[in-house]
Amino acid sequence: MKTKLKFLKLFSIACLGLLMLTNCNQSAEGDDKKSEYKALPASTEFDLVILNGRVIDPETAFDAVRNVGILDGRIALITEESISGKETVDATGKIVAPGFIDTHFHFQAPVGYSLGLRDGLTSSMDFEMGCAGSYIAPWYEARAGVTQANYGVAVSHELARAMFIDGSDGADYLINGPIAAYTTRAKTGWSQTRPNLEQGNAILQEIDKGLQSGAVGVGSTVGYMRAGVSSREMFEVQKVGARYGRATGAHTRYTLGNDTEENNGAQELIANAVALGAPANVEHFNNPGWRLAHEMIIRLQEQGHNIWGEIYPYAAGSTTINAEFLRPEIWIDKMGKRYEDTMLDPVTNEYYTLETYKATVASEPTRPIVIFKMPADDEWKWLTLKGVTMGSDAVGATPYLAPWDFPMDSLGGTHPRTAGSRGATIRLGREHKIPMMQLMSILSYNAAKHLGDTGLKFMQERGRIQTGMVADIVVFDPETFRDNSTYDKGAVPSTGMKAVIVNGQVTVRDDVLLPVFAGQPIRFEPQDKPRFEPISVESWNATFSTGMPSDFSGGVPVPDLDHPESDKH
């Protein structure tokens, strides 16, 4: 394994220059092709045609039966005229919509992409856990040319803390991005310890390295680190992202919590973003108090702020058993829950007791669990919310690093949202008569819009069925497309998908995954220079004070020296 990782690192260095050149050319090429395709006649022989489908484009609210011609990986023509091509998808009676986009997909591995594709997922990112900054470039290079769906990752706040507080710096497993947390979470400093000034600057510099390398944004699991991460540290983390104009996505500070705590956590992320003039993604806010969280987000959008929120259509969540908010003094004493009713082991399909919880935390602290937290009747209501995005929070199944064609019925230990979030969305929409345009906005366009507004060219060309856009497309039966995964069997793929097209290539046809590897990196162009600015007492005083005493430390992520008791937990 170590030999393979070393090879990947060397390979990534060799390829980086070529890929940077390729990325630079994509934007100009895309603009040229948009103007070229506007003049294409229906007599053109296309690479692929999608015939007689109900075309839905959320950005323009277009909804009509049309034929779609695809050439060189882009939508070249949308027409009522007859067209032909080298390959055909008969979409009669089917929906033709933008490929689904997920900003919160942890299972960034070959079989994870396979599960997503069966569910219509053409583009996925991990905007919560992310990847350590120093490993962003090799993370992308390891997937180049061998990945079936589009892939992206944020730079990780949590893993930066693990590197400089728990000593994970330089560990080979960090190249695996979000999956690395199954190793780093065996220690506790990443979640419990407040850094000193030197450590704090190292954490922020590591985040900057990832953004310099093209990470889609900053991912923070502050809700798992509420004791260790001060409000100042969270602000400084978002400030690093703000220097690049990129979003911070966060599992907010008090998730899981009661309605007031949940919204206070969202308010921290949002207030920081507004103060910094930066984008933000309030992740999986479908928790207690979700109506207020949504209202705040929509009101800010109406004022012009690029702030958005994610939901997923499941009443239960999933995490590792040692999550801070699941400790007995919080989950039982404070929130009034019982492990016997709420905490399920997805491998054994048994509920925990206090005794088995304590034993498992001691012996296997990063064991995945399913946690029931909300009424099931709320699942469809979240799908009616204006402007939200689908963030499935898809977690890994075992074996995590299985090949793309590994038998899905042999995968274990995962939440049904990993395989079924999009199928569940369409099924619930069908059962509750939610307009298809709304569902397609949630599943595709809304994420593309918000990420595109951060300057991410990749997303400015996706999430839409329009001439000149990249041909990431799903074709599905609106009456039969559905999820099949359950809490008992979480990795059963969805069915009812006629075709999934990635960058113009059919990757799923009639619910069969094909050996097509057309996935492209969802990534900003790497920057020549870092934008990291170390923090210090002196720089804070010079900016915000006319003569602050030298022992004041309010501007750095260290304990308040005027009130040292504030650092005791």
Question: Language-model segments: which ranges?
Answer:
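Bacterial N-terminal signal peptides
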Residues: F11-T22
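Alpha-helix-loop-beta-strand connector modules within alpha/beta enzyme cores
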Residues: V146-Y151, F235-A250, A275
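Acidic-and-aromatic substrate-binding clefts and catalytic sites of carbohydrate-active enzymes
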Residues: H106, M129-G133, R226-S230, L256-E261, ...
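Active-site neighborhoods of metal-dependent hydrolases
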Residues: V155, R161-G228, A266-V274, A278-L443, ...
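Histidine-centered catalytic micro-motifs
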Residues: G99-Q108, V222, T248-Y254
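Active-site microenvironment of metallo-dependent hydrolases
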Residues: C24-R66, L71, E80-E81, L117-S123, ...
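Metal-associated gating/positioning segment near the N- to mid-region
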Residues: E81-K86, D90-V146
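Bacterial N-terminal signal peptides that target proteins for export
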Residues: K2-S12
